[in-house]
A protein has these predicted regions:
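N-terminal polyanion-binding entry modules of DNA glycosylases/AP lyases
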Residues: 1-86, 134
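Catalytic DNA-binding helix-loop module of base-excision-repair DNA glycosylases/AP lyases
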Residues: 16-23, 74-128
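C-terminal interaction modules of eukaryotic adaptor/scaffold proteins
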Residues: 114, 133-134
Length: 134
């Protein structure tokens, strides 16, 4: 993955976006950018993820820390994703304000109120300045 782009700018699907959000929690983007391509080769979709042995996924994400917690969040989110209506991202397990804001920006092309994350703020300023000036 390119270092000059956000993780969210380099994934192929909404599900992969949500995986990236969970992987970014309590870790650095450089670590995540090394892990995601490997994970998405093994499990490119939620169905593939749910059918991949837990130990395989855990070995891939181990370097991100909190491996059991992170794996359980990914598994529950992937299961939720299969029936999610695509509206409110916080309805997916493990997805909070950051995940919701980034989903709205990158997939719904909406600028959320009170974006808190500094990288998302920078993206809003660069890409949506005319829509939401500071």
């Amino acid at each position: 993955m390119r270092d000059d782009l956000m993780v969210q700018q380099q994934v192929e699907t909404v599900w992969q976006h949500m995986v990236g959000v969970i992987c970014l929690n309590c870790t650095g983007r450089k670590q995540v950018k090394k892990v995601l391509p490997i994970l998405f080769t093994v499990a490119p979709t939620p169905v593939h993820f749910l059918n991949t042995p837990a130990n395989t996924v855990k070995n891939i994400i181990e370097s991100l820390g909190m491996v059991n917690i992170r794996y359980n969040r990914l598994k529950r989110m992937s299961n939720d994703f299969l029936t999610w209506d695509g509206e409110d991202a916080t309805m997916l397990h493990g997805i909070g304000k950051y995940g919701s804001d980034s989903y709205r920006l990158f997939y719904k092309h909406e600028v959320p109120d009170n974006v808190g994350d500094h990288e998302l703020k920078r993206y809003v300023e660069e890409e949506f300045y005319d829509l939401h000036p500071n």
